[in-house]
Every structure is written in structure tokens, then in C-alpha cells.
UniProtKB/Swiss-Prot annotation:
Residues 17-83 form the HTH gntR-type domain. It comes from Bacillus subtilis (strain 168). GO terms for biological process: D-gluconate metabolic process. Pfam families: FCD, GntR. This is Gluconate operon transcriptional repressor. SUPFAM superfamilies: GntR ligand-binding domain-like (SSF48008), Winged helix' DNA-binding domain (SSF46785). GO terms for molecular function: DNA binding; DNA-binding transcription factor activity. Gene3D superfamilies: GntR ligand-binding domain-like, Winged helix-like DNA-binding domain superfamily/Winged helix DNA-binding domain. The gene is gntR. Transcriptional repressor of the gluconate operon (gntRKPZ), which encodes the proteins for gluconate utilization. Represses mRNA synthesis by binding to the gnt operator; the binding is suppressed by gluconate or glucono-delta-lactone.
Amino acid sequence: MLDSKDLLYPAKWLSKASTGVRVAYELRMRIVSGLIESGTILSENTIAAEFSVSRSPVREALKILASEKIIRLERMGAVVIGLTEKKIAEIYDVRLLLETFVFERLVKIDIEPLVKDLSKILEMMKVSIKYEDADEFSFQDVLFHETIIRAIDHSYIQMIWNNLKPVMESFILLSMRVRLKEKYEDFTRILDNHELYIQAIKTKDRALMIQSLHQNFDDVQDKVEDLWLSQQMLAKGAEYNND
């Protein structure tokens, strides 16, 4: 495999992953960032040579990415589809549906352990910003929402989340790297939104939860064509890696 400093995806997050999975994560980051452009044909031999691996893990990686619909497997090789603004918006559509459903279940259960867990994660997010660690902030941000999803113990909701997570995580990583360098003040808004989430769950207040969800997701939807969600922004996220 490539040296960790040459990778876009944080290598420490994949210490126990198979070679194929690690190749998939790196290729995904390159595709989402636009470093590998839509329409590019990926060759098993070329990828294997670049990553210093055999073709078997490369095939595994390409199958993973094909299942996520960001590449298409054809006879001549794997054709990159990429991540469009429409796809980003659709990911957030599904997240809004998921988290709205989950909240309806949360009001029926004991949420004290969940509130404690979310409060801890939020503190870690604050520490990450204090030390200007965009990658750790991204990890904690995804973990925050995943912890909410897991709290209702719903296997099919979890399955949908697991399918969304890889591409969504790549997008979040790249966008947070740019925010840290160019729009640091925006983290205050993000942290405030997460505080609102916790308060809504703690009080089981549906109106507050709807407010917190829409504050988070409508902000994204309204800006789908803006710099933060454009290919230019994602490419910048790749440039800012390991700065």
C-alpha cells in the first residue's frame, strides 16, 4: 500500500481493514474529491501497480464502489460515475427521513444513556476544533449521528445507514478540511446545531427536533449549488489533506 502521508483517507481509521477495503476507501476519496474524474476508466492492473497490491484486492475494492453507484463495472474496466450535486442532495434527503423516523422511536424509550453518549461526542468535537483537527471532527460528527441511529436497535434502518455512510463520510471529511482552512467560524453553527439535537432528544420535544433537523439539513439543501458542496470544494479538501 501507499505511504499513509500519500493517502486522502486517514490510514489510522483502517488499521484492521482488509487490503481491498483500504483500496476502496482511498479510491472513493479520490472519486468524491474529483481527483479521479467522472468518465475515467479504472484499470485493475494500473490500480494494483499504484497501490503495490495484487489484482484480487483491487477487484474487491471495485465491487464495493460499484455497489455504491460511484463506478460502473464494464468489460473494458470500471467507469467512474462520480458524486454529483444531485446525489449529495439525495443522501441528505435519506438522512432527514432516517433521523426523523428514529426520533419518533426515541420518544418511546429511555434516552438518558444516549444523551450522555452524545454529550461526550459533542465534547470531543469541540476538542477537535480547538486543536484544528478536521479529520477527528469529521469522525466524531459521523459517530454522533450513527449513535442516534443505533439507539433504536432497528436492523433495517442500520442497514440503510451503513449503505449511506462511506460516501457521506468521504464528503464530510473533504468539506470539513476546507471549512477548517477557509471558514473556521462556521464550526460554531455546526456545534450549536448538535447542541440543539441533544436538547431535543433530552426533552423528547418533537417541535425542537424538527427545528434541529431542518436547521441542519435545509442548510445543506439550500447550498447544494454553493461552493461548499461543489466539486471545487471537494477538490480543495484533497489539497488540504495532511497540511
